[in-house]
Amino acid sequence: MDSRPIGVFDSGVGGLTVLKRLIQVLPEEDYIYFGDTKRVPYGDRSKEEIELFAGQIINFMKEKNVKAVVIACNTTCATIDKGKYDIELFDVLKAGAESGVYCTKNKKVGVIATKRTVESRSYEINIKSINPQIEVYQKACPEFVPLIEKGLYNSHLAYKAAKDCLEEFKGKEIDTLILGCTHYPLMEPIIKAIMGDGVKVVDPAVRLSHEVKEYLERSRILNFGKKGKIEFFVSGDAENFKRAAEMVLGKKIDEVFIVDIERY
């Protein structure tokens, strides 16, 4: 047994969709969640900025004595060198690519993500490393994250943005669409309605949460015997984050702590 918490971080509220899946699979674990609400979105940031931000956040997580860190941000996964950190890191992008490979029947996979993730070609590279025959079609949807951060993921504006973005996949005959940004599952009902029944919409957090569980079991560092607790930290706006977190997780949150992340 190991009662140390699991760290989860994202540029904002998107990683809460990953946290929700983790809680479902590992309800007895404690969690430290960090949302970089001061510097969201990451999609248009430079490689150097994202590497700096990730280093600061991972240092913060180490100070919190976490036993593993879940990078719940595809843009970060697509940008940083994960090998340089001396802590167990879980990669939502890798889990998403693997899910897409195992879901597709016709070997035609779509990916929607931030501009930086698409430009990195990380999904395409990861998918083709498993099965080179799969055709990968990618589309950046930069309008999604600002809408979701404002809580407008069920709005008419969100529907219009999704319809415009997903138009790209018409005629491509994809049977699988990967939500390549952890914010996007909050728009999943809209995305599914637009894509129709013939396309399987993949949330990478489903596979990722089971990978974390398997690692904890294998390493014999599971926590058990009590209901887990969650501590929330942000770098900027705490009130909007608190509202969003309560909506996504379906539970009341007592406090969100603001941390000066740049000192790490």
Swiss-Prot record:
Xref: InterPro entries: Asp/Glu/hydantoin_racemase, Asp/Glu_race, Asp/Glu_racemase_AS_2, Glu_race
Binding site for substrate: D10, S11, Y42, G43, N74, T75, T182, H183
Active site, per annotation: C73 (proton donor/acceptor), C181 (proton donor/acceptor)
Keyword Glycoprotein: no
Stated family: Belongs to the aspartate/glutamate racemases family.
Superkingdom as given in the UniProt entry: Bacteria
PROSITE patterns, sorted: ASP_GLU_RACEMASE_2
Protein name: Glutamate racemase 2
EC number: 5.1.1.3
Any one GO molecular function term: glutamate racemase activity
Pathway(s) of this molecule: Cell wall biogenesis; peptidoglycan biosynthesis
Gene Ontology terms: biological process: cell wall organization; peptidoglycan biosynthetic process; regulation of cell shape
Residues spanning the membrane: none
EC class: isomerase
Catalytic activity entry: L-glutamate = D-glutamate
